[in-house]
């Protein structure tokens, strides 16, 4: 699992994010037990530990990347200040070194984007006052020239090019990475990127997706097991360095795309060639050869 991947990468890792704090149906923090355990385990090690905050809602009306929740948390100044205080207080109570802000799905709402920007300035100041580091995770679709604060580290997701929302393909490819890195130059330093392990499976993806079955994210280990089980030979795609294969079983055709360490190293090299030295890996667990990742 994640612990094994961390052990394999230990000498190349200088920070770890404990993912994730979300919200319950009353807009109160929901902290899973495994996050508490992870914080306790990693904060004793010689690396920076971040507590990650998302705008996911856990419970009966479960919702990921909930925009309505962000409006309630950031919509007026009193709510925003309360949100800042609560994030900083929780991070301080856990004894972590920093806050990782992973709010998503706000950029298309111009008014919410402006509220979010004000919020990041206030959160940045509060983190400085409380001796906490701040990392802000951003989707590649965010307008990076919108006026972000100097001070935090900005981590841009270099994935989700293909996934459950689309037809088959790699989570990232050269064109997507280079386009996003060019846009990122509008962000203040320090700039970093996040790369995704694993891949996705598409069942019965017909012409233009008119006929489509199950789509699910899978780990590298699961992808390798599927290829072995169905005697499929993965091929490496030139544009993305990702591996892909198809197989037929039980009357269904399935296409699988996934990343291995060679894929991730190609992406890391591309980012490094554009001046990005800091790379986050999402996520640890289910990888077969993660020790092969380059750190430079």
Language model region names:
Residues 1-81:
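Glycan-recognition patch characteristic of GH18 chitinases/ENGases
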């Amino acid at each position: 699992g994640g612990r094994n991947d961390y052990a394999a990468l230990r000498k190349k890792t200088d920070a770890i994010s404990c993912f994730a704090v979300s919200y319950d149906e009353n807009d109160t923090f929901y902290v899973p037990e495994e996050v508490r355990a992870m914080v306790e385990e990693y904060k004793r090690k010689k690396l920076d530990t971040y507590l990650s905050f998302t705008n996911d809602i856990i419970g009966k009306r479960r919702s990921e990347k909930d925009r309505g929740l962000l409006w309630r948390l950031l919509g007026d100044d009193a709510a925003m200040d309360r949100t800042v205080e609560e994030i900083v207080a929780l991070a301080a109570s856990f004894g972590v070194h920093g806050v990782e802000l992973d709010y998503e799905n706000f950029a298309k709402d111009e008014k919410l984007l402006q509220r979010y920007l004000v919020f990041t300035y206030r959160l940045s100041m509060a983190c400085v006052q409380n001796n906490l580091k701040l990392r802000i995770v951003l989707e590649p679709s965010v307008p990076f020239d919108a006026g972000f604060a100097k001070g935090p580290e900005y981590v841009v997701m270099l994935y989700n090019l293909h996934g459950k929302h689309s037809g088959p393909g790699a989570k990232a490819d050269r064109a997507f990475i280079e386009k996003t890195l060019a846009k990122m130059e509008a962000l203040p330093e320090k700039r970093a990127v996040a790369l995704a392990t694993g891949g996705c499976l598409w069942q019965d993806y017909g012409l233009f997706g008119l006929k489509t079955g199950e789509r699910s994210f899978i780990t590298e280990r699961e992808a390798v097991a599927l290829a072995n089980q169905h005697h499929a030979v993965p091929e490496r795609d030139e544009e993305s360095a990702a591996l892909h294969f198809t197989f037929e079983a039980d009357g269904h055709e399935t296409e699988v795309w996934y990343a291995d360490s060679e894929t991730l190293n190609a992406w890391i090299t591309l980012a490094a060639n554009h001046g990005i030295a800091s790379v986050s890996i999402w996520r640890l667990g289910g990888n077969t050869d993660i020790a092969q990742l380059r750190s430079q």
